[in-house]
Each structure stands twice: as structure tokens, then as C-alpha cells.
Amino acid sequence: MLNRIQTLMKTANNYETIEVLRNYLRLYIILARNEEGHGILIYDDNIDSIMSMMNITRLEVIGLTTHCTKLRSSPPIPMSRLFMDEIDHESYYSPKTSDYPLIDIIRKRSHEQGDIALALERYGIENTDSISEINEWLSSKGLACYRFVKFNDYRKQMYRKFPRCTIVDSMIIGHIGHHYIWIKNLETYTRPEIDVLPFDIKYISRDELWARISSSLDQTHIKTIAVSVYGAITDNGPMPYMISTYPGNTFVNFNSVKNLILNFLDWIKDIMTSTRTIILVGYMSNLFDIPLLTVYWPNNCGWKIYNNTLISSDGARVIWMDAYKFSCGLSLQDYCYHWGSKPESRPFDLIKKSDAKRNSKSLVKESMASLKSLYEAFETQSGASEVLMSPCRTFSFSRTEDTFSTSVINRVFENTGTGTYHPINDIPSLFIESSICLDHIIVNNQESNKYRIKSVLDIISSKQYPARRPNYVKNGTKGKLYIALCKVTVPTNDHIPVVYHDDDNTTTFITVLTSVDIETAIRVGYSIVELGALQWDNNIPELKNGLLDSIKMIYDLNAVTTNNLLEQLIENINFNNSSIISLFYTFAISYCRAFIYSIMETIDPVYISQFSYKELYVSSSYKDINESMSQMVKL
């Protein structure tokens, strides 16, 4: 089995091989090392992320295990309550999602019946979901003629003597609960099909759910510590045996992982006497250090670990940053070299426990030298970033791309006197992130050549982006930027599926799309019905000048330490769907996707095998490389 997976990893550069590898990852976790000896845990949920960061064919497969788990996720974002919008039809009235739909109905009826309106104004009514309680209130106010009657009871001829009664159709809707529809016209009424939506767009547009980006960047911290966790191979899978810190202590324990972790946590608690938050800086820590500790994390130790955050029972927080995400793909030694510190080799992970125990003194010494180099490099990079990317501080972000892009946007806003806002609540954040599609859309599995946009920044820097707060609109306005909840119907003819959906058998579905993606989809032949949108009436001017200013400042700082990093950033910027500027990313990704589709329009669809927002896979047999393809680079 191990030999089979080692062979697959060495040839994992095509779709078919990667899919076979995924099948094994449903059963096993792969233990691998990079060329510098850093351990990497590969499982089914993180293989795509790893492939986006490095060439996995160059990894050394050490073993397989079922004794290691993936990252422990943060407590999930509460699911947005499913939403039904108000429908006011000549035959019926269906209130929007509410805890008290009967109250909404009586208030709606008061618009037509002045005596109900007068009673509501004079006496008010308590919230209730009980028909009998509402009828009791109506009777006490001399309004029994408007009593509420269930549709089924009315059809049984029980209430014909109340011609002015309020007839309601009652139902229970999954994930929402009891719902009622006021039937205005019995002769024409049929129970409607009501769209149950994942978001209430009008709620999401509320001002208090949005904050200006610049006000969210003013953060400070007290202490930064470099850290590395080292793991050895045992019969029960990998186990951590050493945790090194700089400046700080090194903890070694071959007999009890629990005591190793507890000693480390006690030390952390001791150094947090003057601050509530510290920053731990690792390298590729999200791929090995953190998931390995998560497996062995002791219960009732006073700390919880969620992804890259440690939270104590008294509210103290430790943020574990991965400096690799700020390196633009450099190895640890290259990263240290580029930021002016002396590159030092680190101890190899996933060695035999007996070897680690025998060489523990030299491993501790080697680890401390490597961590000192990492610490100095990160401090230098952070200092440079604070100057070049003000007011953005490295520790406030998870990746260089986020820091750089936020700095550019903020600089443009400062120069124009405008500002942009980001969601500060889980629900609008989830709505924005739902519009970001990073997936590869598979058309077919033919052997293909891979092309990538030469410069994503060139494409996105000349486009428009939202400024100020959004407004709610039922349907977006052509020519303005908006993000809409959409009911999408796929074309009946053969087409390239430009709108991603995870169920190929569904022809109609609800999803979140930007105005840019909507325009692209309509060109392909999709039918789009907008069910509510966030619309921005103001745009920021193009980013090109601000971008060029930022690039020039970085180049002018120090050609030795920054140019190579910047060139990699410009050539291969990556977006994600979780950032303070996710609103910017969602439109940037849409612009790139529109560009990719404009190229696909010039190619016979039979030659297209798959694509993403910045990559295109074209059949190896395709020879007609046209002018538009000159803006792509073959990988």
C-alpha cells in the first residue's frame, strides 16, 4: 500500500492520478516530508490546499496512518436562519419569516380595516402564535367578525356565518416552523410555492452590520514568539516529542505527550501576565504542528485549540501564525535568507522515536538555531510591512496577499477621501463568502495542458470595486456593482457550466452571485432571477495607480530582500474566501472568471476540460493557440 501511494504522489500532476489519491485519503492520512524535512500531514480535506501551496510530487512519503486527525475546526458559524420573503398577492398574503406570522397578518389586515387599525393603535397586542389568543383579543375589542379561521375548518362549512373572518392556510415548513397565509380570495387561491431562501438580504444590509475597513486595522500586540513542534514515528502513528520556542524554552518529553503539552501551556500562561494576546509564529505549522498537537490535546487543561487559535478558560488568546503564508511559497531557508537572517537547517520530522531520543541534545540545538533565524526573518518582514503596507500589520492577516491588497485599497481610499466597509457579523460575512467560487469546474477528463493568467493584478487593477455601505434592492441596477441571491436555471443546450453547483443533476438552484458573474452567466444562456441584492451606489476609482505606488515603494525599499517576493506575489496572487477584504476578493475573482470565459469563447468547447477563476485546462490536441491565449502562461 505504501509503495502504491509513493508512486501516486510522484506522478500526482494530472486529474486522474489525483482522484485515485483522494480515494486512499478517505481511509488514510499520508505522512510526508518536504526537502527541508518539515512534516506534512495530507488528508482528504486539505490536499487541494496543499497542492495550491507546493508541488506535491516533490514530497517524500514516509508512511500512512489512521491515528491522526485533521484540524479541529472553530465552533461553526451559526447557520443563517432560512428566510421567506413577504408575498402580497391579490389572492393571498404570505408574511416574511417571523416568529409571529399571525401578528403580521393582523397588522396587514389593519391596512384595509380601519377598526382593526384603531384597536391596535389604542390597545396594542402582545406577540402570540396562537389563533385562539388572537381571536380572544379580537372578541374583547368588538372585532369578532374578523376572527381567524383555519382554511380546513372553513371548508367544512363550520364558519360560513362569518363572511368577514380572516381565513388562514396553516402549514409547517422545515427549518422554519409554523407559517400562515392569509387567504384574501377563496375562489382564486391555490397554495403557492414559496422560495425558502438561505439569506435575508434586507437584514444583511443593515448599517450596524458593517464597519469601515480602516477602523478595523488599528490593532496592537505585545509579544511574538517563534515556535516549532517536532514529531517522531511510532507504531501508533506520529507523536510530538519536542516543542521549541524562541525567545523561550524547549520542551522535550518522550514518555508523555500530555505532560509535554501541559508544560508548554504552563509556560505560555506565565509569559502572558501583561497581555491577553500573544503571537506564535511557525512555518508550515498549519500542515503539521497544529494538527499533530490537536490529536493529543488533553481534556480539561484550561485551553481549547481551534485551528490556529488557542483560547484559555479565562479568555486569553494565542494566535498561531504560519509565516509560510507570507513567504510566497519560499522554503524556510530561502525565506530567512530573503529577509536578512542566517538560514539554518531544522531537525527532520517523522524520524524514528528511538533516533530522536538518541540525538535529542543535537536536535534541541539545531531547532533553536533554526527558530532564531525564523524569528529574526519574521520580525524584519513585519517591520518592513508596517512601513510599506501601513496601516496593515502582518499579524492582523493570515496571508501576504491579504496584507498587500488591503494596503493598496486603503491607500486608494485615503487619496480619494472615500471608504469601503466590511461585514462585522457572521451572517453578512457568510453571504459575501458564498459568492466566492474558487472551485475548478470539470467539463471532461481528457488529457490537457494547463494555462494560468499571466498577471491577475493586471486584470483586476483596472476594474471597479464597491465603496461605502451597501443598500438593499429587490433587483440590481444594470451598471452598478451588486451581489444578489439568485435562482439560477441552467441552459437546456450544450454549454460550459460557468456557474458552479455541486449537484450536476439539478437544473434549477439558488446561489449567490456578483453582478459580474450574473452578466457572464446570462451571456452563456443561463436564466437568472434575482431574489434580493446588496447594491453599492458608489465605486472606488481603479486601483492601478495605488497598486503601482505600492509596488514602487516595495521595490525601492531593498532589492535584495523584497524583489523576488514581490515578483512571486504579482505573478501568482491567490485569493481566499475568508478575509477582511473578502468583498474586494469576490469581485476580483468574478473579473478574472469573466476574463477566462472570454478566452473560452474563442475555443471550441470540445477542447476545454476544466477551469477555475485563473486557470484553464485545454486539450493537448488543441493547436490553434489564438491571440487571446497570449495573456495566459502555459505551466
From Swiss-Prot:
Alphabetically list the UniProt keywords. Answer: Early protein, Host endosome, Host-virus interaction, Late protein, Membrane, Microtubular outwards viral transport, Viral release from host cell, Virion, Virulence
InterPro entries under this entry? Poxvirus_F12L (IPR005005), RNaseH-like_sf (IPR012337)
Superkingdom of this entry's organism? Viruses
Main location as per UniProt:
virion
**Bridged cysteine pairs (disulfide):** none
Outline the inducing conditions.
Expressed in the early phase of the viral replicative cycle.
Q: Name one GO biological process term.
A: microtubule-dependent intracellular transport of viral material towards cell periphery
Q: Which Pfam families match?
A: Pox_F12L
Q: Name one GO cellular component term.
A: host cell
User: Of which family is this protein a member?
Assistant: Belongs to the orthopoxvirus OPG056 family.
**Which function does this protein serve?**
Plays a role in intracellular enveloped virus (IEV) transport to the cell surface through microtubule transport. Together with protein OPG064, forms a complex that interacts with host KLC2 (kinesin light chain isoform 2) to engage the kinesin-1 complex and thereby promote IEV trafficking.
Quaternary state and interactors: Interacts with protein OPG164. Interacts with protein OPG064.
Q: What is this protein called?
A: Protein OPG056
Q: What is the lineage of its organism?
A: Viruses, Varidnaviria, Bamfordvirae, Nucleocytoviricota, Pokkesviricetes
Q: What's the name of its gene?
A: OPG056
